[in-house]
Amino acid sequence: MLKSNNTSETAAHKVGDKTAKKVFFRRRKGCPLSVPNAPVIDYKNPELLIKFVSEGGRMLPSRITNVCAKKQRKLNNAIKIARILALLPFVFQAK
């Protein structure tokens, strides 16, 4: 029992050590589609949907666009519907 108490003390000393590297955490920005006055996600709005599609025509992941999971699912469905209705191309042509 003394051994487990001793290890917790040494772990506490290591955490409080000034020579230890500080870990930098970047604060994640909020979802751009959840703010007030945000545009409505709709398949009939290709100008909005094109912002969430890469140059090659692939849907960008939420870790790049900072969109929350709920809005990401709505975006994916809207992009798929817009592609089927020929409002968005499946593959963008190289220039």
Curated annotation (Swiss-Prot):
Q: Which GO terms describe its cellular component?
A: cytosolic small ribosomal subunit
Transmembrane segment boundaries: none
User: For this protein, what is any one GO molecular function term?
Assistant: small ribosomal subunit rRNA binding
User: Does the entry annotate any disulfide bonds, and if so which pairs?
Assistant: none
Q: Which Pfam families match?
A: Ribosomal_S18
**Highest taxon of the lineage:** Bacteria
Endpoints of the signal sequence: none
What's in the keyword line of the UniProt record? Ribonucleoprotein, Ribosomal protein, RNA-binding, rRNA-binding
Q: Which GO terms describe its biological process?
A: translation
Gene3D superfamilies in the cross-refs: Ribosomal protein S18 (4.10.640.10)
Alphabetical list of PANTHER family matching this protein: 30S RIBOSOMAL PROTEIN S18, SMALL RIBOSOMAL SUBUNIT PROTEIN BS18M
| Cited function | Binds as a heterodimer with protein bS6 to the central domain of the 16S rRNA, where it helps stabilize the platform of the 30S subunit.
What family is this? Belongs to the bacterial ribosomal protein bS18 family.
Subunit structure, as described in the record: Part of the 30S ribosomal subunit. Forms a tight heterodimer with protein bS6.
Q: What is this protein called?
A: Small ribosomal subunit protein bS18
Q: Where does this protein come from, organism-wise? A: Rickettsia africae (strain ESF-5)
